[in-house]
């Protein structure tokens, strides 16, 4: 119906997590609901669990409790293994099903020239590398974007 919208929630219940050998949990019985349309930032000192929380959302660690996710998650930074390849080839390796027109749209918004795609990734500056990888992330549809320390 016109005017209606669908609110998708990440529903976290009784989340408890601790690293092996830790004296106390990082998260203890956490309950939280996050609307997937929200744009949120976690601010805190080093070692306070921000990256751990994102990795829990990505199912990188075992935990107690439940995390119900209505959409797939996409995590940044990407893990780049080979810096010597042409940038476009690298992007195809990182996200095989991306659509070039969406990537080009995001590149335009981030003011990245299209010639960047045809240069070896290694020759890009650190800022260019970050921007092209963010453009790839932003080009994904129907995903919750988890961005960890993008600078």
Please describe what each predicted stretch is:
Residues 120-124, 128:
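Conserved ABC ATPase signature
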Residues 3-29, 36, 113:
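A short, flexible loop at the N-terminus of ABC-type nucleotide-binding domains that lies
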Residues 51, 128-131:
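Conserved ABC ATPase nucleotide-binding domain "signature" region
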Residues 137-144:
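A short, proline-enriched helix->beta-strand linker immediately N-terminal to the Walker B motif
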Residues 134:
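Hydrophobic anchor residue at the start of the ABC signature
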Residues 145-149:
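Catalytic Walker B motif of ABC-type/P-loop ATPase nucleotide-binding domains
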Residues 105, 112, 116-120:
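Interfacial catalytic loop of ABC nucleotide-binding domains
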Residues 36-45, 51-103:
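ABC ATPase nucleotide-binding domain signature region
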């Amino acid at each position: 119906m016109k005017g209606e919208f669908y609110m998708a929630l990440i529903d976290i219940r009784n989340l408890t997590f601790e690293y092996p050998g830790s004296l106390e949990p990082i998260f203890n019985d956490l309950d939280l609901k996050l609307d997937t349309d929200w744009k949120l930032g976690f601010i805190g000192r080093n070692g306070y669990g921000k990256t751990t929380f994102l990795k829990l959302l990505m199912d990188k660690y075992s935990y107690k409790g439940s995390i119900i996710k209505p959409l797939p998650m996409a995590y940044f930074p990407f893990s780049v293994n080979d810096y010597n390849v042409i940038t476009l080839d690298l992007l195809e390796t990182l996200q095989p099903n991306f659509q070039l027109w969406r990537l080009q749209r995001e590149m335009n918004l981030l003011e990245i020239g299209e010639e960047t795609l045809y240069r070896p990734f290694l020759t890009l500056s650190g800022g260019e590398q970050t921007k092209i990888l963010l453009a790839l992330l932003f080009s994904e549809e129907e995903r919750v974007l988890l961005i960890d320390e993008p600078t």
